[in-house]
Amino acid sequence: MKRAYNFNAGPSAMPLEVLLEAQEEFLNYKNTGMSIIEMSHRSNEYAALHAETKKLLRELMEIPEDYEIMFIQGGGSTQFLMTAANFHTKKYAAYVNTGVWAKKAMAEGKFYGEVYEAASSADKNHSYIPQEFTLRPDTSYVHLTANNTIYGTEYKDFPKFDVPVICDMSSDILSRKVNVKDFDLIYAGAQKNLGPAGVVIVIVKKSFLATAREDLPTMLKYSTFANNDSLYNTPPVFAIYMVNKTLHWIKKQGGVNAIAKNNAAKAKLIYDVIDNSDGFYKGHAAPEARSNMNITFNLATPEMEKDFVAKGKAAGFIGIGGHRLVGGCRASAYNAVPLEACKALAEFMEEYMKENK
């Protein structure tokens, strides 16, 4: 079976090894005579899977014991709401505006109080990561977006603040090593580097969690999930099962450092073509802010970009069109995208340039 070169921005490529394992045991999970999707979330088999998934995540990310790990439904967009609902307890909440997803988070924050931009990269169409920040007194938290899928930028070093830091890591979690202790809350939708859509990983410092509001509907309170081991209601069992498989795969590759090394090599293949194209391909992100996850670039005209995407699709490259809001082209090289796929795309880009220069 020939597999597509999958550069979709999310849901995105998953390790073939993981898919094959899931296929093999789909009808009979651990000799129970049942599929994992048929089993009670109160069963011993699922309880073991649930606990192991948290343990693997804690090990791979080096999450300290004073941090809670939760599995929540609703996607990253619901986290825009939940973070503000629980923690916007002072006069202001601050957001660093590095693109569409940061702005969406900020829009949800407005439902719970005043918000403001601590910094913004909008002046240059979000092609860089701000380095200077202004915080007002009485600020509840600062919200960061670690990686910007649409514009192809990411923080190389995270800034330090004197207020709690909340970070959306949906598109780069486990792609590189981060110091969890630098954050009070991290959230990440699974559908880019962790598994399929359907579950969000939330990592929160217990002392920060203790400051959350409790006068909220049950399913909007983080304490509901923390106090019930994310089992207050039926969790997204299959999504968590696939996250478990993916975490095992990451560990087998050598852990986060090995994954990060491979990701840097993959991105370099494509950025090198862009940089050596004499302007045929124009990278959107400033070199010092380039994402290893989402490589964004433009060609001379929108018509040429459409032709590039169409010919790329015919050659087996899926998902290389830019986001509908900004156009252009984008290759999303998440953890599970193999090096061979990036080599093939780089070769296709070279060939297309020769034919159209």
How should these model regions be labeled?
Residues 281-312:
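Conserved PLP-binding catalytic core of the aspartate aminotransferase-like
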Residues 166, 180-191, 200:
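Conserved active-site segment immediately N-terminal to the catalytic lysine
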Residues 3-4, 314, 327-357:
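PLP-dependent enzyme catalytic core of the Aspartate aminotransferase-like
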Residues 3-54:
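A glycine-/small-polar-enriched, mobile loop at the entrance of the PLP active site in fold-type I
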Residues 10, 109, 121-173:
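Active-site phosphate-binding strand-loop segment of PLP-dependent enzymes
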Residues 15, 190-271, 286, 355-357:
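Active-site C-terminal subdomain of aminotransferase-like
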Residues 77-142:
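PLP-dependent aminotransferase-like
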Residues 32-79, 86, 100, 108:
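Conserved N-terminal alpha-helix of the aminotransferase class I/II PLP-enzyme fold
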